[in-house]
Amino acid sequence: MAASREFIICCFLTLLLCNFFMRVESGAAADVSRGGCGGGDGSLGDDNERCVEAVKEDDDDDVDDVYKVINKMRIYA
């Protein structure tokens, strides 16, 4: 019961494709270890610590610009 040539080529191409996707995924994970949490060495300080980006002081929510009361007037539709 020998495996056909097409089956072996299909398995080899599947292996190459999976290897490509693993490299792409590990490249995205490497970005976290370069900067963010735990001092840049890729480790977290505590077991329960999560990587959270610091919020800038001048960061303003857009909600303030959407809902405004102008001259305390009511608008009826």
Swiss-Prot record:
Residues 1-29 form the signal peptide. One of its GO terms (biological process) is cell-cell signaling. Disulfide bonds join 37-51. One of its GO terms (molecular function) is hormone activity. Keywords: Disulfide bond, Hormone, Secreted, Signal. Its main location: secreted. It is found in: Secreted. It comes from the Eukaryota. One of its GO terms (cellular component) is apoplast. Cell signaling peptide that may regulate plant stress, growth, and development. Mediates a rapid alkalinization of extracellular space by mediating a transient increase in the cytoplasmic Ca(2+) concentration leading to a calcium-dependent signaling events through a cell surface receptor and a concomitant activation of some intracellular mitogen-activated protein kinases. Belongs to the plant rapid alkalinization factor (RALF) family. This is Protein RALF-like 17. The lineage of its organism: Eukaryota, Viridiplantae, Streptophyta, Embryophyta, Tracheophyta.
